[in-house]
Amino acid sequence: MQAYLDLIDKILREGVRKPDRTGTGTLSIFGYQMRFDLGAGFPLVTTKKLHWKSIVHELIWFLRGDTNIGYLKDNGVGIWDEWADDSGDLGPVYGRQWRSWQAPDGRTIDQIANVIDEIQRDPFSRRLLVSAWNPADLPAMALAPCHCLFQFNVRDDSTGTRRLDLQLYQRSGDAFLGAPFNIASYALLTELVASVCGLTPGDFVHTFGDAHLYLNHIDQAKLQLSRDPRPLPRLRINGNVKSLFDIRFEDLSLENYDPHPVIKAPVAV
């Protein structure tokens, strides 16, 4: 995960101070890209311990089309608690946009089901996109989408293996707390879609707009940079699962994850 540490290092060296919505203040860079070969291991940061259970259950929650934190709470995940209202609702956030985008004529569009169908029907299409950025719904969202657009790509490599890539565009990225989580989440999504579509995982490409370190995360970021990355773990997926929407936590296993200890930092709300 040297690619991730390089991002942290660049922000610390070149970031400019900017005010932000939370009032915390940031060091920020604009326009940055990382690439991860999923064949080299699952890109779960090893220079601090991440909560695998939260990563998996949040993605399952998105794929369910859910926008209430009840499912997350039932599974011991509290990462969305700060933004939910008293009934646990978040408004039309990721799950709604992914699975039930509201069309002007009253229809709802299941972007995830559509993109899987398209991968299977026309794998070399350049229209394999999913967007969570719906301007009409932004005012009703508890938090505007940070990771707002992703695109799949199918290609045959030099050995004739058909691979699935994914590129994420993230308009805003909390480099210390959020980015490691986002890397793992979209790498997992790539692996899952590849599995149900009979493809081999290829590259995960992570493109940022504003990538930043909050000013109260600087010491933690420097501590993380002082640690040497360890070998990446391997992800195993239950091969009996044929639908993306049937995935359960128990269908996934992470092998040989040996991270450095957790580094705590406050969440900017």
From Swiss-Prot:
It is an enzyme of class 2 (transferase). Belongs to the thymidylate synthase family. Bacterial-type ThyA subfamily. It is found in: Cytoplasm. Catalyzes the reductive methylation of 2'-deoxyuridine-5'-monophosphate (dUMP) to 2'-deoxythymidine-5'-monophosphate (dTMP) while utilizing 5,10-methylenetetrahydrofolate (mTHF) as the methyl donor and reductant in the reaction, yielding dihydrofolate (DHF) as a by-product. This enzymatic reaction provides an intracellular de novo source of dTMP, an essential precursor for DNA biosynthesis. Pfam families: Thymidylat_synt. PROSITE patterns: THYMIDYLATE_SYNTHASE. One of its GO terms (molecular function) is thymidylate synthase activity. GO terms for cellular component: cytosol. The gene is thyA. The active site is at C146 (nucleophile). PANTHER family: THYMIDYLATE SYNTHASE (PTHR11548:SF9), THYMIDYLATE SYNTHASE 1 (PTHR11548). Keywords: Cytoplasm, Methyltransferase, Nucleotide biosynthesis, Transferase. (6R)-5,10-methylene-5,6,7,8-tetrahydrofolate binds at H51, D174, A268. This is Thymidylate synthase. Pathway: Pyrimidine metabolism; dTTP biosynthesis.
